[in-house]
Amino acid sequence: MAKYRGKPFQLYVKLSCSTMMATSIILTNILPYDAQAASEKDTEITKEILSKQDLLDKVDKAIRQIEQLKQLSASSKEHYKAQLNEAKTASQIDEIIKRANELDSKDNKSSHTEMNGQSDIDSKLDQLLKDLNEVSSNVDRGQQSGEDDLNAMKNDMSQTATTKHGEKDDKNDEAMVNKALEDLDHLNQQIHKSKDASKDTSEDPAVSTTDNNHEVAKTPNNDGSGHVVLNKFLSNEENQSHSNRLTDKLQGSDKINHAMIEKLAKSNASTQHYTYHKLNTLQSLDQRIANTQLPKNQKSDLMSEVNKTKERIKSQRNIILEELARTDDKKYATQSILESIFNKDEAVKILKDIRVDGKTDQQIADQITRHIDQLSLTTSDDLLTSLIDQSQDKSLLISQILQTKLGKAEADKLAKDWTNKGLSNRQIVDQLKKHFASTGDTSSDDILKAILNNAKDKKQAIETILATRIERQKAKLLADLITKIETDQNKIFNLVKSALNGKADDLLNLQKRLNQTKKDIDYILSPIVNRPSLLDRLNKNGKTTDLNKLANLMNQGSDLLDSIPDIPTPKPEKTLTLGKGNGLLSGLLNADGNVSLPKAGETIKEHWLPISVIVGAMGVLMIWLSRRNKLKNKA
């Protein structure tokens, strides 16, 4: 150290240089790797995280791809859209699209399998119903005796039972129907027993190689296919959800019930023994299914649908009989039942056609059932005629319908001409068909589709069309269901027709469930609503006070609300949401009369310019008023 003691500067220089060299060596060996790693990482981030605009564009494109997937349900599409809106990177978007495509492909394959199975079952059912129409036409003649009804039946047991029914007089209508239900149950039990026995026999190797070879050869690729389809599209009557049973084409129990109603209508069956004849027709179909050479799984599915149809008839009959048994005023009970299903105008017309004097409950129930069944035969002509019939301003409604194909001036002129000529509602419908024919549309179906396609509020338009035939609250529920099930405009109309043609008898069950729900709610709220007031507690000893006298005086006479007329039923020309209606404030309210925030946002987006002008004008006006007041105060 003595050597460097006199030269401290040289020592510091050497130490500094050594330190710098060591540091440079270390940095030279480490930094390139860090720089390379950082560069690679930056490249990955650049590829992964797109710019904000590019990401939004990719999300929009992905959402359009999701919309084009045909097999995905509406709820699944909304789920994937929500995930896309939350995606932060391109890889997340690609992964969501991949999952959606896989699910769509899977649903497509299962849908084809189920549709093929359902199509096969429906074709067999159509053939059976056609054969039944040819063979058992005698069953549907309302005035025939029970012995004549047996011409379509090939079972000895059914012959004996039905012959006994024919010997009953009108006073035993209810017993006849009960016996028919018992016979149908007994027949089903016998068929199922024979089916189980044949199944056990077919499992025997010695037998399966002989007589059953032909039947087994038919079944390999069809096992379970019918159950898969029917379990998906149909459910039993205890299922309160209609969404999985309402389809654009009648299937299963709906198809059977509709075919029987058509058959009874074509044969001009009277209301006498109506339910009994309906059950006899169903029994004939059950026997035909049992005697066919169909594969066992298809036969089982078809017989299950027959049993569902029987339960529907039984349930509807029980509800009607219960209502009639509650009161001695049969006309009032009948009116109550009709008004719970039909709209007021239809209920009044039907009530005039029903005879209650001197009739048993079963005979009244037969008349009501027949009219409910006729609701299933509603055609598009009937719907259009009812729309025009129930409108307050026919000319306006006709013009709105014509404007879906013609210009406003021409539509207004034609509408005025037709109303001034005094054409009947049916004649107006015929004229509408002629003018729609010029654009290639020739039927009432096409006209109603045009109405739905051009309606600004699809749900309200569907409700309006249904409400021309059924009670408005039921129409509202069905319209809500239809718009939730289907968004395809081409299929919405089919669902509307299916709701009337296949679910008319469900309306009574729906009303029963609504009544039960109302009772449950009343039971819950009763302790709150009916709790005693402060005055009741002060006056608990029952002494008459001045307040009691005042209350009695105020309660004398008619109620204050009695003088206020009922709210009129909305007219079709105002509720179909056709014609002009794109004003600044249109669409701000939902069906319940509350402000709809999504619709309000859409309205502001579409009309931002006039809204901006109005808001600006109001601001300028307020500033001017403020300054004017200041000047007045100074003066």
UniProtKB/Swiss-Prot annotation:
InterPro entries: GA_module (IPR002988). Keywords: Cell wall, Peptidoglycan-anchor, Secreted, Signal. Residues 1-37 form the signal peptide. A motif (LPXTG sorting signal) lies at residues 597-601. The lineage of its organism: Bacteria, Bacillati, Bacillota, Bacilli, Bacillales. The modification Pentaglycyl murein peptidoglycan amidated alanine is found at A600. Its main location: secreted. It comes from Staphylococcus aureus (strain NCTC 8325 / PS 47). This is Surface protein F. It is a peptidoglycan-anchor. It is found in: Secreted, Cell wall.
